[in-house]
């Protein structure tokens, strides 16, 4: 089993099956997803607690990134995709026809595997979403830029070159800039799809430290192939295999005393 430093665990384990509505950020109910004739998710149900870090782990192709992208309807961009079931945010199914998808994605931000800054200045990257929302007051934009860059733990590194091109930053800095851009519009939920897979170990550590800070303000859901990373940063872990949610519990339980044989086999490296 993977050892976990209990001193690093920031929150107490919660009863995920009986999580009260006021403590639930998202609830996924009986979710199925198909790409054409191929089913990628099978009857997934889970509750994701507010202001904690939930990790999705599992072997390649298990459906973890597919599930993550369901949470802000990124899979809508795939023509052959068909979804059944519900994902509830504030008690409303985000797949209801009345839902404003653009508004949903403002409330549920996403950061991808590779840093994707825009070909603009550092400053304009951060305030881009705010400008789209109609914010034009320079003082308000300046305050939002500083707040977001501080929130992404990169302010001290860029405060004297805010108007330099974002492509001049290192990979790790670019990823933190992208996180700053995501939190500038103040989402409730932040989705991270393997956010450190393209980064060096030092940059990875910086992002992991940032994730533990982000949950003070946001609900964070992370997909990672790195089990040690999941053990370090998450409060809950969901293990997925072949499109099914095999086991979902507090991270300490998943990595030390899993209840399902498939989970134990994956954690101990018997496959994956």
Curated annotation (Swiss-Prot):
Span of domain ABC transporter: 26-267
GO process terms (BP): phosphate ion transmembrane transport
UniProt cross-references to Pfam families, sorted A to Z: ABC_tran
EC number(s) on file: 7.3.2.1
InterPro entries: AAA+_ATPase, ABC_transporter-like_ATP-bd, ABC_transporter-like_CS, P-loop_NTPase, PstB-like
The keyword Translocase is annotated on this UniProt entry: yes
UniProt KW keywords: ATP-binding, Cell inner membrane, Cell membrane, Membrane, Nucleotide-binding, Phosphate transport, Translocase, Transport
Positions in coiled-coil regions: none
Membrane topology: Peripheral membrane protein
Molecular function as annotated in GO: ATP binding; ATP hydrolysis activity; ATPase-coupled phosphate ion transmembrane transporter activity
Protein's cellular compartments: Cell inner membrane
Entries under Gene3D superfamilies matching the protein: P-loop containing nucleotide triphosphate hydrolases (3.40.50.300)
Binding-site list for ATP: 58-65
Catalytic activities: phosphate(out) + ATP + H2O = ADP + 2 phosphate(in) + H(+)
GO CC annotation: plasma membrane
The family this protein is said to belong to: Belongs to the ABC transporter superfamily. Phosphate importer (TC 3.A.1.7) family.
Record note on quaternary structure: The complex is composed of two ATP-binding proteins (PstB), two transmembrane proteins (PstC and PstA) and a solute-binding protein (PstS).
Chain's role: Part of the ABC transporter complex PstSACB involved in phosphate import. Responsible for energy coupling to the transport system.
The protein's name: Phosphate import ATP-binding protein PstB
Organism encoding this protein: Shewanella frigidimarina (strain NCIMB 400)
Encoding gene (name): pstB
């Amino acid at each position: 089993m993977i050892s976990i430093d209990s001193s690093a665990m920031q929150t107490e384990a919660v009863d995920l099956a009986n999580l009260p509505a006021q403590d639930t950020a998202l609830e996924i109910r009986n979710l199925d997803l198909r790409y054409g004739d191929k089913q990628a998710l099978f009857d997934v149900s889970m509750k994701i607690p507010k202001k904690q870090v939930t990790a999705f782990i599992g072997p390649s192709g298990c459906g973890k990134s597919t599930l993550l992208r369901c949470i802000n309807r990124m899979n809508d961009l795939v023509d052959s995709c068909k979804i059944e079931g519900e994902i509830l945010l504030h008690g409303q199914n985000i797949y209801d026809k009345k839902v404003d998808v653009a508004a949903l994605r403002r409330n549920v931000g996403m950061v991808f595997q590779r840093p994707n800054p825009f070909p603009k200045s550092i400053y304009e990257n951060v305030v881009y979403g705010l400008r789209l929302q109609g914010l034009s007051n320079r003082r308000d934009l300046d305050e939002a830029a500083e707040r977001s860059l501080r929130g992404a733990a990169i302010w001290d590194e860029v405060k004297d070159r805010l108007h330099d091109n974002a492509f001049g930053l290192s990979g790790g800095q670019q990823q933190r800039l992208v996180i700053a851009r995501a939190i500038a519009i103040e989402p409730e939920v932040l989705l991270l799809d393997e956010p450190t897979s393209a980064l060096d170990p030092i940059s990875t550590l910086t992002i992991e430290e940032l994730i533990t800070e982000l949950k003070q303000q946001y609900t964070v859901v992370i997909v990672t192939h790195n089990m040690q990373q999941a053990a370090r940063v998450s409060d809950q872990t969901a293990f997925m295999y072949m499109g099914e949610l095999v086991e979902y519990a507090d991270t300490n339980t998943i990595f030390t005393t899993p209840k399902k044989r498939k989970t134990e086999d994956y954690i101990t490296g018997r496959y994956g």
